[in-house]
Amino acid sequence: MTLFQKLQWFCQLIRLRAYYKFLLLIAYTLFGAWLFRFYELQADIKRRAIYGNDTNLIRRQLAERWIEMHDDAVLRNNSVLRRRRAAEAVDWLLGELNLSDHMREFSEDTPWTWTGAMFYAGQLYTTIGYGYPTAKTDEGRICTVLYALFGIPCFLMYLKAIGKTLSKRLKKIYKRVRRSAFGKFLLPTRVTATKDGFEDPDASAEERKRKPFPIPIAIILLIIWICFSASMFCQWEKTWDFPSAVYFFIVSISTVGLGDMLFRTPDMMVFNFLLILFGLALLSMCFELITDRIAKWKQKRFDEHIKKVQKMAFQVFEKDPFVEEAPPLGIRMAPNLMQIAATHVSEEKRGFFAELKDWFAGKVTDNVIQSKLEDTDDESDEDEALEEFESPQVATLTANDLVVCTNGGATRRVSKQSYAFSDVSNLSNSKIPPGNNYGQLLDRIKAMEKFKPKKGDLDSRMFAKFLENKKLAKILEQTELRELATVSCQTDLSGLVVQRRNPKGRHARIGSCSSQSTMSTFLPRNNSHAPDEDSVMSITFGDLKFDYITEPLIDEYHLRESNHSIFDFDDDEVVRIPQKMLVSRPGMPPPPPSRPSQLASPLRALLEKEQKYDEDPEIQLTPRRLASLTDVQARKVKLGYDENLQHARLVCGLLPQDFDSPSTSTSTSMIDSGYDLSKRDAPVNIV
């Protein structure tokens, strides 16, 4: 048991998940307290020591002056001079105690002018609160509370709206700059493409128009505005330096408002406040862009994980395309036991940081999934049903709990709960967890993922945690899965198969591609079959299925093997290609002519291969094979002249038909590729 696992066990023991956010807030507060105390404590102690020494010095000097005034005979007889000396002593005392500024505050004009009152109102609804001026009367304080309660929500809504508007305006300006000659020269052009070389239909024109304003440029604009506003403050407030002005502006736009620095020019308060408001709008825009980017990152990770699940699900059914009958196996033999034994072959020793990365990947994945799920009122009921399903009482079945089902002559006893799963209406009475329509499929996908070699990158760990999440089945039911398409490119133009291009799927730019939709070929259908929970082998390896299927999971057309092969050609037939079609690439010598066999039997071709042949003006190509005892009557294929082929040769030069056909294997069992069937079933057309 590693250190990280011990920490996880302790957190589960004290139920840390219920109040960890509050503990994080307390920890952040303690960190801030330590940080500020570390930098401010010693300096404050020094200031207090100096102030204490100065206070004692002031006391002594003040006492000496009073004694001097009392003992001086001249001052005793001259009252005017005595009052003057006393006033000088009091002014000196006030200056030493730093009380002159406070006295000057009350000696100046009232701050409750129109500009000062507007500045105070702005402090309230922006939640800055500098602490000057302040309301002293009871009526003023009551009005302050009511004004803040109504003004703060309105200002937050306005700030969000102005942030979006500012983002749109800056985005338009950014587009104009990019389209200009200066922008094309200065800013690089980004080309978006998928990894497999095909176009991404999701990257439509509308989504490209919705591309947000770049975050780095927004942050640079915010920094420029902070520096500009700080320089303006330095011009109006003569006692401020540039770092102090930057500090004041950042504290203001973050709505902290410590109040240690205040404006001393009442005439410029409104203009200064407008600078702060625009800074708040820029900061809100940056937060909005960052939040949108995080949301899009979550959506992207979610879509990638869903696509991986779809591909792996298609691989599961692709490896097991046939549904066969088999005698019944044991009932309720804990089907997950063999899966655990097959996947957990060895325990890998992992360090603390690897466990920490797994924990972080799990938390991020939980956040991504939770953001996609809708808040439902029956969440507690689902948790109770899940706990009931995981209880060991489910494995205890009696003979009364079993039903007998038949499928094409194969008889099998299954549990009532498993059989009831074929009907959605009976789902509430079953022992299957709610929303677990993908149970069998997800078990196979998890087994495939665990068999793969583990990678240390964050994306792989996030996908593994994505599959292990308990809410995956529920989110698969609520998510509208996108349509995927398998794309195969064919270079042999003679047997070209052209199908209608799917507008929603991916398609290649160059060449001929035939795509078939694979979406919904692996998804379990409600009311179609019951998941085979009682089968041990099917859950683990996916090589047998005992389901009661009313409709095939995969189209039989794609699962049907062809009875024809590209090697089943008659050796007596010579395929002749017109000479005018054989146009080589400019600057390249023509390919050497091949020597095809004109004999009727491949055995005679082997015995008389030293025979000389007359060169024919037209190149003769014959698919050849070695001698076999199972010769089958083959079809006669002859390629005719086609203008499209001629055009393709002019553009591409050599085509695969210009070379000898690949030699076949010496094995007597010929592998059927379905090539000839595709030529008979599909029309020949050239794109």
From Swiss-Prot:
Question: Positions of the region Disordered?
Answer: 661-687
Gene Ontology CC, one term: plasma membrane
Per the record's keyword annotation, is Lipid biosynthesis included, yes or no?
A: no
- Biological process GO annotation list? potassium ion transmembrane transport
InterPro entries under this entry?
A: 2pore_dom_K_chnl (IPR003280), K_chnl_dom (IPR013099)
Intramembrane region positions:
112-132, 242-262
Specify residue ranges for compositional bias: Basic and acidic residues: 677-687
**One GO MF term:** outward rectifier potassium channel activity
Give the keywords, sorted: Glycoprotein, Ion channel, Ion transport, Membrane, Potassium, Potassium channel, Potassium transport, Transmembrane, Transmembrane helix, Transport
Task: State where it is primarily located.
Answer: membrane
Source taxon at top rank: Eukaryota
- Cytoplasmic side stretches: 1-21, 163-212, 291-687
What positions does the record give for glycosylation? Answer: N53, N77, N98
Membrane topology, record value? Multi-pass membrane protein
List all membrane-crossing ranges. Answer: 22-42, 142-162, 213-233, 270-290
Q: Where in the cell is it found?
A: Membrane
Q: Give the protein family.
A: Belongs to the two pore domain potassium channel (TC 1.A.1.8) family.
Indicate what this protein is called per its UniProt record: TWiK family of potassium channels protein 12
Q: Which source organism?
A: Caenorhabditis briggsae
> Which gene carries the instructions for this protein?
twk-12
